[in-house]
Amino acid sequence: MITLEHISKVYEGANRVEALKDISLTIEKGQIYGIIGQSGAGKSTLIRCINMLEAPTSGSVIVDGTDLTKLSASELRKARKHIGMIFQHFNLLSSRTVYDNVAFPLELQGLSKAEIKERITPILDIVGLSDRVNNYPSQLSGGQKQRVGIARALASHPKVLLCDEATSALDPQTTESILELLKDINERMGLTIVLITHEMQVIREICDRVAVIEGGVILEEGSTLEVFTNPKKPTTKDFVGSVVSDNLPQEALEHIELHDDWIAGTAPLVKLKFTGQATDEPVVAGLVRRFDLDVSILFGGIDYIQNTSVGRLIVILNGDPMKAQEGLDYIRTLPIESEVIGYVRASN
């Protein structure tokens, strides 16, 4: 559906800036695709290259089989009708009602009043604004304003919806409702949605795949589940850790003395990660039953990512050192990830 091939963007001037550096991505039809990065990472420039609001310095932008970089100005205007966009700050016309804001792009396209009404009435119903059609932006909450922006973007019946930090100006509860709306639109209309954000929680909630961008370069890309369960780059680990932490809380670390070596009187401190059906594995019970170990659980939790359960445990394997080693060997035979963090004082 969307293919970016070797996209680069350079802003020339006294302070030359390489905003994007040789980026290649493929976004399949019907996906919700997230691009995450900190301020200045290049994510806004990248998403604006998809609809050519920013023309790349080099590379190809192929949307639904058409390379937008090769189109004339008039051809590009036609192609953009199939690419909707919503913005962080809504960009509504204060002098127009909800209905007239949504109708505005269709008026520019020359549709009749009857055609416009037929087009946008069901859209206003989908976004939950049927009872607000005569309200002005000043009479709306932030979430309602964003719903107007979404309705306006959908009015042209796009195949692609671009979301430029669409929830970053909203409170958490409103953000949740907007994300639910985007999921509903994706499922109901089969829209391909590309969103940029600096919030990993947004990625976790609705995205099928995610790309992590930093300094104009894609650091890491994969399914949301893959990236959450196995982040490779430090930046990605920081993003994931802001939402799902599998590290021992600082409060707990302050009460234990961690050793690098397994010395007398210490026991292994082990991090365990389970995905999918592996969360049903009775690991702790197995260690107690098979090896007569006293397993102390210091930290644990289960999250759900892309409808898949992801569990985490940090445990101490107290007991006879030989039995503890056998327990570690046993853990490594299971369909779970494990890591010995270090060694702590064993309980008596």
Residue ranges and their predicted role:
Residues 136-140, 144:
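Conserved ABC ATPase signature
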Residues 66-67, 103, 107, 114-131:
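Conserved ABC ATPase "signature" region
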Residues 155-159:
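A short, proline-enriched helix->beta-strand linker immediately N-terminal to the Walker B motif
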Residues 203-205:
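A short, surface-exposed alpha-helical micro-motif characterized by mixed small hydrophobic
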